[in-house]
Structure formats: structure tokens, C-alpha cells
Amino acid sequence: MIVFSKYKTFWFFLIIGAIIPTLAFTTSKLLAPTVTTPEKKTSYESGIEPIGEAWIQFQIRYYMFALVFVIFDVETIFLYPWAMSFDQLGVYGFIEALIFVLILVIGLVYAWRKGALEWS
């Protein structure tokens, strides 16, 4: 039982972190008005009545750019803590970050050669 006592804080925050959003969504669902009118069913286009269909086919290029953006956006999220603790990590931390960046550069070169970054 002593082993589990050091995890009390973790379980407390995990339970609270699950209860608060659940209560927020449940309260919102219970208190939200449920009367639907024709005006509420239309899509909002800056105050202008929409013309045509809302469902259009996107070109795959948008998805490729979005995927490449997300990959490099996540890279910055991982590199920021590394940059903040660079002086404490030493040579091994630098080598690990260098390997991480090199893997991403290889992925970028691969995407570039496959034509994922070309718009034509």
C-alpha cells in the first residue's frame, strides 16, 4: 500500500480532469435550447444566404500541405522543451535532438521528391 501512496496526487488530478469536462458537457447539453428553426438549420456565411451546395470535393494537395504542416508544427512543440533545457542535457541531449531533426529532414526531402510540396 505504501507503493501506491505516491500516486495519490496523480489519481486525484486524473479524476478531477475527467470530471470537470464531463460536467461541463453534461450541463451544456441539459441547459441548451433544443428548439430548431429553419434559420438555425442553415449554414452561416457572414450574414449572407449560402448559394449552392456546401459539400465540395477538396483536392488532395490541401491534405498533403496540412500533413506536412502538422508534422513540423509538432516538431517545434518537441524542440521547445529541448531548447529550454539545452545547457542541462549536455552532449547526449544534443545528439538526440540532432537525430530527431535529421529524421524530420529526411522526411521533408522524401515528401519533396514525391511531389507532395508542389502545387501544379
Swiss-Prot record:
PANTHER family: NADH-UBIQUINONE OXIDOREDUCTASE CHAIN 3 (PTHR11058:SF9). It is an enzyme of class 7 (translocase). Belongs to the complex I subunit 3 family. GO terms for molecular function: NADH dehydrogenase (ubiquinone) activity; quinone binding. It is found in: Plastid, Chloroplast thylakoid membrane. Keywords: Chloroplast, Membrane, NAD, NADP, Plastid, Plastoquinone, Quinone, Thylakoid, Translocase, Transmembrane, Transmembrane helix, Transport. This is NAD(P)H-quinone oxidoreductase subunit 3, chloroplastic. Its main location: plastid. The keyword Cell wall biogenesis/degradation does not apply. It comes from Chaetosphaeridium globosum (Charophycean green alga). It holds the Pfam family Oxidored_q4. The gene is ndhC. GO terms for biological process: photosynthesis, light reaction. NDH is composed of at least 16 different subunits, 5 of which are encoded in the nucleus.
